[in-house]
């Protein structure tokens, strides 16, 4: 058979099949057009699951009567003018294919009016045959009405594969639901066979956005969801995630949006699941998340229906979503277990009987406060309490005494007042935590157990001398988790130690490399000391619970340090001198 160009009506039907798969595809395309037109009210009326007719009415800006015929032609759009505009897209449509594809497989009526038109215009088309075009004036308010009749009337083969009308209508409902979830300021209504199915009222207050979830998911208990909002890496993440310690059975809801466009993306799902796995192993994870990202950092034009998207820096997006979700889950974890401990303590204090060590409120409270910490610390605590088989239930948390002594109070955010053997001591928590982290790093290097954090490759330009210094030190750097790829004139950094990921690692790495360039010879101890001074000592507010946690870590990781503690860690307070002055 010779090669020939297909007739225009046949080629249009074939290309339309990629975009218009079912009635729900029509609903999606025309709603997105209405949103691009700035509509505040969108009403959808469906007959016979969309096979008989689909009607959409909106109050958008409308289509000028001189552009009405052009609007139903292939590749006719007002969204882009040049190839560079694809990097600046803020609209749903841009290819100019939606109405042309719908026209190719249905009997289409398009009525529209702009604020500049005295009268509206109506156009009627059957398939892609230019002979059946009727254009006439008509009365109509500002906005657009689209009537799609007899869908797939000219493609009977397609109708054979779409026999389940209940399924097709459920697909339409799902499309409306997905779009309504990302456009809170628009009123949506859906009617089927003259019966109102859904009505989603507009929400103008950000605090009330969760009410849209209540409207869409009738049985959903929104109190089981946490609102999150994070801004970083020139991206914004907003939405709701299910409570990590929710023990009720809730519907599995997973919706993710990029620039208000719904899509199912593995980066979202994997990042959220990874964050939950650090807190609580849950099979049933629900979330509705909205990512706002600069349009030039994504590629929408990779799928006919635009249901897929490509990120130019997927690793950065994954890291951002993971860190944002994990930070909120971590706060909830700490709050949840602290409340659990307080309730348990109150309940136990009502009783004055004695019991075995494993019901000790000290043990329970400590376990809850350092939940999910190293198993070795748990064993250490348990061994300590095991020496006293019977302990009073009224033993409060503040009576817990470590080898250093009993922590009484936090002073000036960073220091702990400790009582030990009739002496008062002042402990620096930043120094203590730094020493613990330093010892952990030493242990991990000895065991070759450094955890790496993989980056999107970072290119580092170096002088020939700096290049040579790093090349000579690549083996010792690899022990710390720095993976360097040496090219001819530059170096690529692909991983760093995991303990740097929460820091501003770009500045830390720059300073660290500057330190290496000044050293002709460097040892493991030199690098450990550098991290101790520049990374491990953090000035942040300390709580009583975290203070006890650090005391336990010192006991476990640095027991020899307690024999002769450094002056920067622990200072004895001269109470006797003060008593002599105050003596009556």
UniProtKB/Swiss-Prot annotation:
- Read off the PROSITE patterns from this record: DNA_MISMATCH_REPAIR_1
Name the Pfam families on file.
DNA_mis_repair, HATPase_c_3, MutL_C
What span is annotated as the signal peptide, if there is one? none
Which InterPro entries does this entry report, sorted A to Z? DNA_mismatch_repair_CS, DNA_mismatch_repair_MutL, DNA_mismatch_S5_2-like, HATPase_C_sf, MutL/Mlh/PMS, MutL/Mlh/Pms-like, MutL_C, MutL_C_dimsub
Q: Which Gene3D superfamilies match?
A: 3.30.230.10, Histidine kinase-like ATPase, C-terminal domain (3.30.565.10), MutL, C-terminal domain, dimerisation subdomain (3.30.1540.20), MutL, C-terminal domain, regulatory subdomain (3.30.1370.100)
- GO CC terms for this protein? mismatch repair complex
Judging by the UniProt lineage, the source's domain of life is Bacteria
Q: Which GO terms describe its molecular function?
A: ATP binding; ATP hydrolysis activity; ATP-dependent DNA damage sensor activity; mismatched DNA binding
GO BP: mismatch repair
Q: Which UniProt keywords apply?
A: DNA damage, DNA repair
Q: Which family does it belong to?
A: Belongs to the DNA mismatch repair MutL/HexB family.
Query: Main role?
Result: This protein is involved in the repair of mismatches in DNA. It is required for dam-dependent methyl-directed DNA mismatch repair. May act as a 'molecular matchmaker', a protein that promotes the formation of a stable complex between two or more DNA-binding proteins in an ATP-dependent manner without itself being part of a final effector complex.
Question: Can you say what this protein is called?
Answer: DNA mismatch repair protein MutL
The gene behind this protein is: mutL
């Amino acid at each position: 058979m010779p090669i020939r160009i297909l007739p225009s009506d046949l080629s249009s039907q074939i290309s339309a099949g990629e975009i218009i798969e079912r009635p729900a595809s029509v609903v999606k395309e025309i709603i997105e057009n209405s949103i691009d037109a700035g509509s505040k009210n969108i009403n959808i009326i469906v007959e016979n699951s969309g096979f008989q007719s689909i009607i959409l009415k909106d109050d958008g800006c409308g289509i000028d009567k001189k552009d009405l015929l052009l609007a139903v032609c292939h590749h006719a759009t007002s969204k882009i003018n040049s190839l560079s505009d694809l990097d600046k897209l803020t609209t749903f449509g841009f290819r100019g294919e939606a109405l042309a594809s719908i026209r190719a497989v249905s009997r289409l009526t398009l009525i529209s009016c702009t604020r500049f038109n005295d009268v509206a215009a109506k156009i009627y088309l059957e398939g892609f045959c230019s002979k059946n075009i009727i254009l006439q004036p008509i009365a109509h308010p500002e906005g657009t009405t689209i009537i799609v009749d007899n869908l797939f009337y000219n493609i009977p083969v397609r109708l054979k594969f779409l026999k389940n009308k209940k399924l097709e209508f459920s697909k339409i409902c799902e499309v409306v639901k997905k779009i309504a979830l990302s456009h809170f300021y628009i009123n949506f209504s859906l009617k089927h066979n003259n019966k109102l199915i859904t009505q989603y009222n507009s929400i103008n207050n950000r605090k009330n956005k969760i009410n849209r979830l209540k409207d869409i998911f009738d049985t959903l208990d929104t109190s089981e969801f946490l609102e999150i909002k994070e801004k970083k890496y020139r991206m914004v993440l907003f939405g709701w995630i299910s409570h990590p310690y929710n023990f009720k059975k809730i519907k599995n809801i997973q919706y993710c949006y990029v620039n208000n466009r719904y899509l199912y993306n593995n980066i979202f799902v994997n990042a959220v699941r990874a964050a939950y796995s650090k807190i609580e192993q849950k099979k049933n994870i629900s979330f509705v998340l909205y990512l706002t990202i600069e349009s030039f950092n994504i590629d929408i034009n990779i799928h006919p229906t635009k249901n897929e998207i490509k990120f130019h820096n997927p690793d950065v997006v994954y890291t951002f979503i993971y860190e944002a979700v994990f930070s909120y889950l971590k706060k909830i974890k700490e709050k949840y277990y602290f409340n659990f401990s307080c309730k348990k303590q109150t309940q136990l204090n009502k009783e004055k009987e004695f019991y075995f060590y494993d019901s000790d409120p000290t043990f329970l409270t400590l376990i809850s406060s350092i939940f999910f910490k190293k198993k070795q610390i748990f064993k250490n605590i348990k061994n300590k309490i095991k020496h006293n088989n019977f302990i009073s239930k009224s033993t409060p948390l503040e009576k817990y005494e470590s080898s250093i002594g009993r922590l009484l109070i936090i002073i000036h955010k960073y220091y702990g007042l400790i009582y030990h053997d009739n002496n008062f001591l002042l402990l620096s928590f930043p120094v203590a935590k730094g020493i613990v982290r330093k010892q952990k790093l030493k242990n991990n290097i000895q065991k070759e157990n450094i955890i790496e954090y993989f980056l999107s490759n970072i290119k580092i330009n170096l002088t020939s001398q700096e290049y040579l210094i790093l090349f000579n030190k690549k083996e010792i750097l690899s022990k710390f988790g720095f993976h360097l790829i040496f090219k001819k004139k530059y170096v690529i950094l692909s991983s760093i130690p995991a303990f740097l990921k929460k820091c501003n690692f770009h500045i830390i790495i720059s300073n660290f490399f500057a330190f290496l360039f000044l050293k002709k010879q460097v040892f493991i101890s030199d690098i450990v000391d550098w991290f101790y001074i520049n990374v491990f000592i953090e000035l942040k507010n300390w709580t009583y619970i975290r203070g006890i946690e650090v005391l336990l870590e010192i006991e476990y990781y640095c027991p020899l340090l307690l024999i002769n503690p450094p002056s920067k860690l622990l200072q004895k307070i001269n109470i006797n001198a003060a008593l002599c002055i105050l003596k009556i």
